Amino acid sequence: MKALILSTATGGGHNTAAHAVLEALTERGVECRFEDCVAFGGQKLSATVSNVYVKFVQAAPDAFGRLYRFAKAISTPRIKSPVYLFNAAYARKMEQLLTDYAPDLIVCTHMFGGQSVTYLRRHDLWNGLFAMVMTDYTIHPFIEDIECDVMFTCKAAMPSARRLALPKSAYEFTGIPVSLSCRPCTDKRAAKEAVGLDPERPEVVLVGGSMGAGNLPEMIARILPVLGENGHLTVVCGSNVDALRRATEAYGSDPRVSLRAQVTPLTPLIAAA
């Protein structure tokens, strides 16, 4: 059996989930291939889409929130969205790969790939099994565009899922895929030593995701009073340079706080917490 995993780099979570799916399928003997779906429209397009999205979310989160709510308000299963048309525009460029690789299954961890594959199926250009993996804790706008065989999501998304024009049998409430390495830590002391932390100190890890989402300085301020003098806090700001700068200005001199940018892989640090 062959599987094609489609994702894109608008934030790191989609790719992380995609690689978790790839890892799990490979362990079960499935031949897998990973591709950036937007890159079928060109590497420059993929880089531009990713950079614009990440910078917009980081620089203007309130504006992004308003845009998101507007998109949710106009999202409908009755007509395809402008976002679908964007992703349909480069979908036919996947044909050669589908012919050469001939996957039995396509798994998408981003709406963009899901919309492209939907276009291919609607035009009889590919007819294998199609699975959509939601990497958010909600059903986001324009997901109605996607016509998949099964959609994997989390239980928190059940209320949102009910408004979609998909049969209940199409949902699997499994949660967001994680790497096989994300297992309960059995030796905290060794885990702390492995990432250079003091094994004698209680450790808290604050992660803002790959984009450094949320008000990290404010979260640090809330955690420190309950951390105690012996505790230690590691803050991962991801690619959010501004969040790292503000946190450094406010807490860089506090010996209880360590500030990091992007951490790859993140699992060993989480295991130490």
Regions found by a protein language model. Name each.
Residues 188-190, 197-272:
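Donor-nucleotide binding loops and adjacent catalytic segments primarily
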Residues 1-4:
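Extreme N-terminal starter segment of soluble prokaryotic enzymes
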Residues 12, 17, 69-173:
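Active-site and donor-binding regions of nucleotide-sugar-utilizing enzymes
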Residues 149-211, 240-242:
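A nucleotide-sugar donor-handling region in carbohydrate enzymes
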Residues 134, 175, 261-263:
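Short loop/edge segments at beta-strand edges and connector loops
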Residues 6-8, 35, 133, 206-207, ...:
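Short hydrophobic segments within beta-strands
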Residues 25-30, 122-127, 166, 225-230, ...:
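Short helix-capping segments at alpha-helix termini
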Residues 20-95:
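Conserved N-terminal ligand/cofactor-binding loop architecture of enzyme catalytic domains
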